Amino acid sequence: MTTQKYVQFFRETSPYIHAHRGKTFVIAISGEAVLDSNFDSIVHDIALMQSLGVNIVLVHGARTQIDQRLQLAGLQTDFREQVRITDAHAMQCVKEAVGSTRFQIESALSMGLPNSPMHGARVRVIGGNFITAK
C-alpha cells in the first residue's frame, strides 16, 4: 500500500474509529467458529477493535463441543424445539465442553497475537457472569 493510499484509507476510516471509541460491542461466536481454521483471524479482529478503543463483550456457543463430549461419553440427549434436554449425567459433559471452549478463547486472546501486526498488543480478558439480560 502506497503512502497516499494509506493516508486516504486512514482518513476514510477515522470517523468510524472516532464514532465507536468507548462504545461496547456484543459479539456472539458459535462453537463452530472456535473450531474453524480462521478462528485466529477472528481473535485478531477482536484485538484490533479493542486496540481502537471498542469495549468487547464476547458471548460464545459450544453446541459442537458439547455434542463431541456427549459422543465420547456415549450419552445421548433429546431436543425439543431446538433446545437440548440435559440430564445430570449429560450436564457434566456440558460443563466440560463449555469450560474448555471458554479457556480456548481466553487463551487465544491473551497470548499477545504472535506473528501478527498486533504482536504485543495488550488484550484484557475478564471472564464471568457480569451481565444478565432481561
Ranges and model annotations:
Residues 71-134:
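Ligand-binding beta-strand-loop-alpha-helix segment within the catalytic cores
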